[in-house]
A protein has these predicted regions:
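Secretory targeting and sorting signals
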Residues: 1-23
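Extreme N-terminal leader/anchor segments
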Residues: 24-63
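Asp/Glu-centered strand-loop micro-motifs enriched in Gly/Pro and often flanked by an aromatic residue
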Residues: 55-82, 93-98
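Short, well-ordered turn and helix-capping elements at secondary-structure junctions
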Residues: 73, 168, 309, 321-325, ...
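CBM-like, beta-strand-rich accessory domains located in the C-terminal region of large
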Residues: 77, 154, 352-547
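Aromatic-lined, polymer-binding surfaces characteristic
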Residues: 77-255
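Short, cationic motifs built from Arg/Lys/His that form the positively charged side of catalytic pockets
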Residues: 137, 306, 411-414
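Carbohydrate-active enzyme catalytic cores, enriched for enzymes
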Residues: 185, 213-347, 351, 393, ...
């Protein structure tokens, strides 16, 4: 790869800017480019001054005075790109603005100048100049430029702007594109390059309309990224106002609509449903307000429901369908999660990391989710699925979904009853094919018993039962239960891997699964096309067809 050469004609409009870091007259002016929530919580400015950085939650690394820019102490891709984003350097500039102490600015300048000497475009590792590190690094460089006028910094920002404005490198309809536009606009506003600022606003408007649909759902297939996108759009709109640019209505409107989506994607315990590349430890630290409805179906592929808002012991579920897997999505179509009586019941395997490992790719697979599989048929990745019917009552909701991910129509019907908590699921496939389904329970729940088509799990006094019936309403026996092994794993936090109990049904033409929280010995009966289940709070009856 040839090093990027920036011709003089492309350089920033640098009229009259000369000199280096200067001793500040206290107090130092605090700038909009440096203040804000873009600075990471770790490392602190004092940590950086000591030559020690802690990134992406991993243990601190001693960088020393002379930094090795090829360092990769954990062989972790996220660590590498955050290292080269230089946001940790930005903590020094913020400390300088807040304290007036020149030592912070001098070290920030020293670090950044050294980085630029060793990491010219085309002369460093390719990931250093990929779209996201470039975008995030720009914020730190623009912040530094508010106090350092050296030509090398202007050259660096010009190189960043050239990449950020290159059409073939732009990630349209994705959170990376949003960050690219924020970065390009920051440079354009800093140096009065209206061509860059206008390009950034035009692209951002188009990207936001692609990334956030008209209902407010994020299309990246991992709801936790909606929190990130919402925060970044607040930054973008603030920067526009600071730059004298009118905020387009489409950007403001779509950003506001994300609040309801984030609220519906958040479980009663305050943590987001860990769908796609979403960790179970994601807690939206933002005010979303309380949506008017307890149940919401998003055309982009989500159905959410809960008993009521504001109560941690409310029941809650998620159901996935929609466009085939892309961006931060997993092969979770027709999958469900379930939370009841103040705890997780059914969970996905979760998000482990972005490392290229077998385990990472397994967590994205259909086997890592609560889905039906078609026996003897090959799974076809990235297949879209459809919600074909729904019945949305206050205390009971039912859904019917279908796709051809196995080359034949597979169908899942889901019924959730609130108050007397149950989730009932009916799975089948066309063409006489048999199905087998997978149920992954929260890692705190361990096997108590497995007999007669009833699997009971528990955590201390709390019990939950899984009952499986055939199309004739007879017990379906022969469940396989494993903890660990091939299927029995979850990743509740970043880079963690814990054993969890997984129940795999026997193969059958039609499988009715009933999950009953809070019950150890559920009584289930069938009569006249209806199924009656005795829960901890009373009996529940529903059509054997569910919908």
């Amino acid at each position: 790869v040839r090093p990027l050469v920036v011709p003089a004609a492309v350089l920033l409009a640098l009229t009259g800017l000369t000199g280096g870091a200067h001793a500040a007259d206290k107090p130092v002016k605090r700038t909009a480019q440096c203040q804000g929530d873009w600075i990471p919580g770790t490392p602190t400015a004092d940590d950086v001054m000591k030559g020690e950085v802690s990134l992406v939650g991993l243990p601190p690394v001693k960088l020393g005075k002379k930094i090795n820019w090829d360092a990769s102490p954990y062989k972790n891709r996220s660590w590498e790109y955050v290292f080269h984003s230089l946001r940790w350097m930005g903590t020094l500039v913020v400390a300088y603005e807040n304290s007036g102490d020149d030592k912070f600015l001098e070290r920030a300048k020293e670090i950044t100048a050294d980085w630029w000497r060793h990491n010219k475009p085309g002369a460093s590792k390719p990931y250093v100049w990929k779209d996201h590190p470039v975008s995030l690094r720009t914020q730190a460089l623009v912040c530094l430029s508010m106090h350092v006028d050296d030509p090398w910094l202007k050259d660096s920002l010009s190189a960043h702007a050239k990449l950020l404005s290159t059409p073939s490198l732009y990630k349209k309809g994705h959170n990376h594109g949003i960050d690219q536009d924020i970065a390009l606009m920051a440079i354009g506003c800093r140096y009065k390059r209206s061509d860059w600022s206008k390009l950034a606003v035009r692209r951002l408007t188009e990207t936001v309309k692609l990334d956030v649909d008209s209902q407010g759902a994020l299309r990246e297939q991992a709801p936790r990224y909606a929190v990130y996108v919402y925060g970044r759009l607040q930054v973008a709109m603030t920067n526009m106002r600071e730059c004298g640019i009118k905020v387009p209505g489409d950007i403001a409107g779509r950003a506001e609509s994300l609040k309801d989506f984030i609220a519906h994607s958040t479980q009663p315990n305050g943590y987001m449903a860990p769908l796609g590349d979403g960790s179970a430890e994601t807690e939206p630290k933002m005010e979303t307000g309380t949506p008017a409805q307890e149940v919401k179906v998003y055309r982009s592929g989500y159905a959410y429901g809960r008993t009521e808002w504001g109560k941690p012991d409310s029941a809650y579920y998620s159901i996935r369908f929609g466009p085939g897997m892309k961006y931060h999505g997993h092969e979770d179509h027709l999958g469900v999660t379930y939370y009841a009586q103040g705890r997780d019941i059914l969970v996905d395997a979760g998000f482990h990391s972005y490392e290229r490992s077998k385990y990472r790719y397994w967590t994205m697979s259909h086997e890592a989710h609560n889905v039906p599989t078609v026996v003897g048929a090959r799974f076809r990745p990235r297949t879209a699925s459809r919600l074909v019917d729904s019945s949305l009552g206050k205390d009971r909701q039912a859904y019917e979904l279908t796709d051809q991910a196995y080359g034949v129509s597979r169908t899942r019907k889901v019924l959730v009853n609130h108050g007397e908590d149950i989730m009932a699921v009916r799975d089948g496939a066309a063409g006489g094919k048999k199905v087998r389904n997978i149920w992954r329970f929260a890692d705190s729940l361990t096997l108590v018993s497995n007999k007669g088509g009833v699997v009971v799990l528990g955590d201390g006094k709390f019990k939950v039962a899984l009952v499986q019936l055939s199309s004739s309403c007879r017990p379906l026996t022969g469940q396989k239960v494993e903890r660990g092994g091939k299927l029995g794993w979850v990743s509740p936090t970043y880079l963690s891997r814990k054993p969890a109990t997984v129940v795999v049904s026997p193969a059958a033409a039609d499988v009715l699964t009933i999950v009953v929280p809070g019950v150890e010995d559920p009584k289930v009966s069938c009569s006249g096309g209806k199924v009656t289940v005795h829960t901890a709070d009373g009996a529940v009856s529903f059509s054997a067809n569910l919908i």
